[in-house]
Regions:
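Generic low-polarity alpha-helical segments
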Residues: 4, 35, 48, 162-164
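Membrane-interface helical sensory segment of bacterial ECF anti-sigma factor regulators
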Residues: 1-18
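Surface-exposed amphipathic alpha-helical segments
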Residues: 142-168
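Short, solvent-exposed recognition patches
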Residues: 19-136
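Exposed alpha-helical structural elements
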Residues: 3, 37-41, 157-160
Length: 168
């Protein structure tokens, strides 16, 4: 069947986003998402484009984003509304601050990946007495520190997220 597409150009900051709409009901018009707005606010507030995730596991969706101006950091949370949670923290002035972690879980594995010449340290944990898993990744890019934490996300999925990071 013939479909008619309408092309829309959105300007988001200095980036252009092209969306397509269709007269067919099974194709939904794309719009600027809350997630994109959070990334744009980070850019506007702190003056840089943060590393972005271009892959999420199935059913994982953006939940909320918070910018802490005084602490010079931002946090973005994704969830599948069941038991999978992904927390992404961006620390602009990490030399003068720290991200505190109190991990009492058992460290199972530690390894390093290199994505676009950026070393990423990954630690895998078993959550005590629950059988659930927890994975942390930490890396630095252009003097910004990034921390990605996942609960109940499979190792392969977590690493796929990392392999699909977009560095600006």
């Amino acid at each position: 069947p013939e479909r008619i597409f309408h092309k829309f150009n959105w300007n988001i900051g200095d980036r252009e986003q092209t969306n397509f709409d269709s007269d067919d009901e099974d194709i939904v018009a794309a719009k600027v998402s809350e997630e994109e707005e959070v990334y744009q606010k980070i850019k506007d507030e702190f003056g840089f484009d943060p590393v972005r995730m271009y892959y999420l596991p199935e059913n994982m969706k953006f939940q909320e984003g918070t910018i802490f101006r005084e602490m010079q950091n931002a946090q973005i949370i994704y969830s599948d509304n069941k038991n999978k949670i992904l927390r992404y923290q961006i620390a602009m002035d990490y030399k003068d601050s720290s991200i505190g972690l109190d991990i009492e879980d058992q460290l199972i594995q530690k390894k390093e990946l290199e994505i676009e010449k950026v070393p990423i340290e990954i630690k895998y944990y078993k959550v005590n007495n629950s059988g659930q898993t927890h994975i942390n990744a930490i890396f630095k890019h252009k003097d910004i520190q990034y921390f990605l934490s996942g609960n109940n996300i499979e190792e392969e999925e977590f690493e796929k997220i990392l392999r699909n990071l977009k560095f600006f």
